[in-house]
Amino acid sequence: MNADKKIAIIIINWKKYDLTLNCIDSVLKSSYKNFKIILIDNEVQNSFPDEINKSEQIKIIKNENNEGFSKANNQGIKYSIKHGVDYVLLLNNDTLIKNDLIDSLIQQSSTLNQKIIQPLILNYDGSKIWNAGGKINNFFGTFQTLEKGKGFKYFKRNRTYTDWFTGCCVLIKVEIFNHVGYFDERFFAYYEDVDYSIRLKKMGYSIALMTNSYLQHYESASSKSLNKIEGNLSPYVHYLNIRNHILLLKKHSKSFNLIGVLLYQLIKILSYLIYFLIRFRFNKFKMVLKGLVDAINFKK
């Protein structure tokens, strides 16, 4: 029986308590009830209301520092495995799930004997696709999000597998972690999901895409810049994106074409530097350079 499967739902909070509470509320309304929320709180100063702290369906793991996405998820995964769950569902705190989402994921996993499944992800108002799977370009070393920005009503549900999953929402059978390992904590945040996807594929696993249910997502709400002069994303996010993309390519260098990778990275980084320079976004300019230097100095 699918209802017998015990699920750990790992949610990481950092700064956006209101979004986290809304996400938890949507999970608690789920038609599937055999779950426990593992809430990893990377925010030091604030605290959750009593109804969250005292809930038997929620376990809060409080960190003294912001441990990032990779390490915080690993904390939740290890706790979950220790407590005998069958599946782990990674879920961003800036999402709202449909009440049948978990049921649908478990059903597809059981029916297809599929161990890793990502659902369809829409933007917050549900009008457009945010993520319908991903495509890896092995020549240039790029990772495309498929169908992003396309109207939901025009979406054709004809794809069943994806090259890489997004850590925004993915269901993983716990046996996978025993075989493949945990997220690489050197990434901190960004590209750790692509890295894990590549490792999965190297070990012979496929990643399914489920499109008969979905969730809605605020994009990168917790990592947006608070400084309007610097634009939407913070300088640190640009640092991580530059550094981690190159780290990933170095880590899996045999999977990509060296000439294509160098050409793409040269154009990409120069474009960022020129754009930030002429827009007087000097903090971002410096962080892109720092990301490049740190990635070059990184040893596999």
Identify the meaning behind each predicted range:
Residues D25-N34:
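Short, acidic, metal-binding catalytic loop of nucleotide-sugar glycosyltransferases
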Residues F35-E43, I61-N63:
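Short beta-strand/loop segment that forms part of the nucleotide-sugar
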